Amino acid sequence: LEAHGARERVVVGSFRDEALAPLRGRGFLLTASRPEVLRLYARVLTLRGAGTPAYQACSVTPWFHGLPVPVLQFARMLRPCGIPTHIWTVNDARQARRLWAGGVNAILSDDPGAMLGTLGRPERAGPPVESRTGRPARRLP
């Protein structure tokens, strides 16, 4: 990330705190780790607010081991802290609309074109041809 000047354009995530530990405090944008998400979940249940999170994004799934995750409550709780909520993996347009309307900032999908269509945006072109041939792809703005 540093070699490509991408430190401020990429959010690094891991379920494990120990994987993110070497990056903390070094200017990298990080997602909440699993223990941080569990602490946030406890704060939702006890109505205590988000506190002062040490991460710059919260990336969660709507279901974890068959249990619903309160993603809309996470989004409402984190928005005043300036922390976006990303949800994965959502492929259903109705669910995506409900999540966006509820304050979720981003959706990771197996079908990004369908998600863009749900937002009323045209599908973007695929990756540049040169990236499929093994030659370096052009840099995007």
Protein language model features and the residues they cover:
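Short loop-to-alpha-helix "cap/lid" segments that border enzyme active sites
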Residues: L1-N105, S109-P141
